[in-house]
């Protein structure tokens, strides 16, 4: 039931081996210690940052948070001010109980955070549902985006993908939060294909109890947060992306796709759609033996692609 049954991927095929951790990657405790907040009208938006220079904003998948990008950030901090934002309803952002959690509202939040941090423009790096959010930022605020590095995620009419509709229905029936609860209590379940482990190629290595707690504990806390963890999924409908297609065709900045091949939610054809749609596409790199959350498992690959895209 996660962004559902997360398979694997790759076109300019690559077979890099997973990188679990380097000594300088944040541990969960260090991630928590690094957290900062931006105060917006909608509430407090959590973020972490490291490095200096032009800004790069990293947008995470569902139901994760900015911790997903710890590996890429440490590898890129010498080239960018790397900022990972927790989307509204997820992670450690604290927004009003009735806050709009839709992709369009998330995109507006990203721009508002940029305003608060004094960022005229940023490179965007995204995964899963946030790939749709990144496209909306580019469509609505093209001057604020220097480049897009997009990994498997929502595209055009495949938002939300049909296999995810069952999770949305469970959220509407107040049942998805039980799935989060069980994963916090059962290490085997969370690492299985019935838990978020389905989004990883190597869940036993990636999903330690501390990592699982970092991702899912916020979604099982007070009633407001329990509802928002589900509300994020519900708010994926209606789909805003088809209406953004004309603006994407006019987006004149560099765009690169790095795509897990044959992913069950976000197949190869959607990377091809992006490649054809963006006039300055730098093409697609398909990744073999990868799953939905491969950016967390393969930070070296993400960092390599980001450096090429940014010309550093």
Tell where the protein language model's regions lie, with residue ranges.
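N-terminal export signals
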Residues: 5-21
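Flexible "cap/lid" subdomain of the alpha/beta-hydrolase fold that forms the substrate-access gate
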Residues: 22-35, 42-45, 83, 90-125, ...
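Short, flexible hinge/linker loops that cap or flank conserved catalytic cores
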Residues: 39-41, 50-51, 76, 249-251
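Conserved HGGG/HGGXW glycine-rich cap/lid loop of the alpha/beta-hydrolase fold
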Residues: 49-92
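Generic recognition of short, well-ordered alpha-helical segments
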Residues: 67, 71, 136, 268-269, ...
């Amino acid at each position: 039931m996660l962004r559902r049954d997360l398979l694997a991927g790759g076109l300019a095929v690559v077979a890099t081996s997973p990188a679990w951790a380097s000594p300088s990657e944040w541990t969960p405790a260090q991630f928590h210690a690094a957290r900062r907040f931006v105060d917006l009208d909608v509430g407090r938006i959590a973020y972490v940052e490291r490095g200096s220079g032009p800004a790069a904003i990293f947008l995470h998948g569902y139901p994760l948070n900015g911790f997903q990008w710890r590996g890429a950030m440490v590898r890129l901090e010498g080239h960018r001010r790397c900022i990972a934002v927790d989307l509204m309803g997820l992670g450690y952002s604290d927004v009003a109980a009735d806050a709009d959690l839709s992709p369009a509202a998330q995109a507006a939040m990203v721009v508002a955070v940029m305003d608060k941090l004094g960022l005229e423009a940023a490179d965007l790096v995204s995964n899963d549902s946030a790939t749709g959010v990144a496209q909306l930022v580019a469509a609505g605020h093209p001057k604020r985006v220097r480049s897009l590095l997009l990994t498997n995620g929502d595209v055009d009419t495949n938002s939300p993908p049909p296999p995810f509709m069952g999770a949305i229905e469970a959220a509407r029936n107040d049942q998805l939060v039980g799935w989060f609860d069980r994963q916090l209590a059962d290490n085997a379940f969370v690492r299985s294909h019935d838990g978020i482990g389905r989004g990883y190629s190597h869940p036993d290595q990636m999903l330690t109890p501390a990592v699982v707690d970092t991702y899912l504990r916020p979604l099982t806390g007070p009633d407001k947060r329990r509802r928002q963890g589900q509300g994020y999924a519900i708010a994926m409908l209606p789909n805003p992306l088809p209406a953004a297609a004309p603006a994407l065709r006019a987006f004149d900045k560099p765009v690169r796709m790095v795509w897990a091949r044959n992913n069950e939610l976000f197949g190869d054809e959607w990377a091809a759609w992006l490649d054809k749609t963006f006039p300055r596409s730098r093409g697609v790199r398909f990744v073999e033996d990868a799953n939905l959350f491969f950016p967390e498992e393969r930070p070296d690959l993400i960092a390599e692609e980001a450096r090429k895209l940014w010309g550093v």
